Amino acid sequence: MTLSIYDDIFKQFPTIDEWSEPNEKIILEPFTYLGIITAKELPSMLIKAFNYWYQVPPPVLDLILKVVGPFHAATLLIDDIQDDSELRGGIPVAHKVYGVAQTINSANYVYFEAYQNISKLTPYLKSPETTDLWSMFNDEILALHRGQGLELYWRDTFTCPTEEEYLRMVHNKTGGMFRVAIKLMKALSPVQSLPDYFPLVNIIGILVQIRDDLLNLSPAFTKHKGYCEDLSEGKFGFPLIHSIKADSSNTLLMDILKLRPKDVPTKRKALKYMNDQTKSLDYTFDVICKLEKTAKDELKKLGGNPELSSIFELIHLSSTPDIEEKYKS
């Protein structure tokens, strides 16, 4: 390299502005590393299922999937950093391989790519002058971050929320991701006078999150995220909240959470207490059953949807997960 390139620096600007495919691949590596197939993630599955009603044309539906699918996958990268997770899908999380800085940049890049794709939906709007897709997107992404922010605050200040506070948090955090997809579909649907599907969407969001909290304590989840990872992360999952509130005079769980335990014996002790003393796993399962019935009743009132029924079958739990083997001494 010589100083000659600076003789007329203005000639260099077009070259500087160029962006190559190899560079694109480099900055997306933390995102692509986990091999998340967005079509198999629940938000994308729900989009396809709700399209049974909305009948959004395939080219438009593909664009919505390109907004929501990658955005959801990118949030998982950030979640793993905020939770200091070790595993996702049974392999080391992206930030343990590429570092926190590269992973944050990659996730943010995907966020803005998704946001950019919203502009491609505008030509398909029935009333572009009165429909603001960006506001729809922003409202729910703000809700998502509000929910996530509260959950992190509770964790970092060792503040155990009530069940009602937890439900409002999940309504924002998990529900926001689901609602943004359905709002986009509603705005772009050619069907007139559709029922209000958002109560069903909101129930699904809460059902899915409480189910995930319960499964986090089960053997089936261990290979994907590690054994009782919520305890290591200090997270107030639904079973934990119930157990702590069931006997506020017993500080065992709060003491264990403050340790952020990595060792199995300490986690077993917490799990045994939740299962045997406060029956919190059975309580959580009962709540899941009640929410599932509410969701199915709402689905029936809306006239039914075979694709959504298939998703309910997929996420159905027939009993409280068998965790006995995990805390046997």
Swiss-Prot record:
Read off the SUPFAM superfamilies from this record.
Answer: Terpenoid synthases
- Annotated positions binding Mg(2+) 2: D79, D83
CDD domains from the UniProt entry: Trans_IPPS
Q: Does the keyword Lyase apply?
A: yes
Q: Which positions make up the signal peptide? A: none
Give the cofactor note. Answer: Binds 2 Mg(2+) ions per subunit.
Membrane-spanning ranges: none
Question: Biological process GO terms, please?
Answer: isoprenoid biosynthetic process
User: Reaction(s) catalyzed by this protein?
Assistant: (2E)-geranyl diphosphate + H2O = linalool + diphosphate; (2E,6E)-farnesyl diphosphate + H2O = (6E)-nerolidol + diphosphate
Asked whether the UniProt record includes Lyase among its keywords, one would answer yes
Q: Which UniProt keywords apply?
A: Lyase, Magnesium, Metal-binding
UniProt EC number: 4.2.3.-
Q: Which top-rank group of organisms is this from?
A: Eukaryota
Q: Name one GO molecular function term.
A: lyase activity
- Write down the Pfam families for this protein, in alphabetical order: polyprenyl_synt
| Names of required cofactors | Mg(2+)
Q: Where does Mg(2+) 1 bind?
A: D79, D83
The extra comment attached to this record reads: IDS-like terpene synthases originate from a geranylgeranyl diphosphate synthase (GGDPS) progenitor in fungi, after the split of Melampsora from other genera within the class of pucciniomycetes. They lack coupling activity and act as classical terpene synthases.
Q: Sum up the protein's function in the record's words.
A: Terpene synthase that shows monoterpene synthase activity and produces linalool, using geranyl diphosphate (GPP) as substrate. Also shows sesquiterpene synthase activity as it is able to convert farnesyl diphosphate (FPP) into (E)-nerolidol.
Family assignment from sequence similarity: Belongs to the FPP/GGPP synthase family.
The name this protein goes by in its record? IDS-like terpene synthase 1
Q: Which taxonomic lineage is given here?
A: Eukaryota, Fungi, Dikarya, Basidiomycota, Pucciniomycotina
Gene (UniProt): ILTPS1
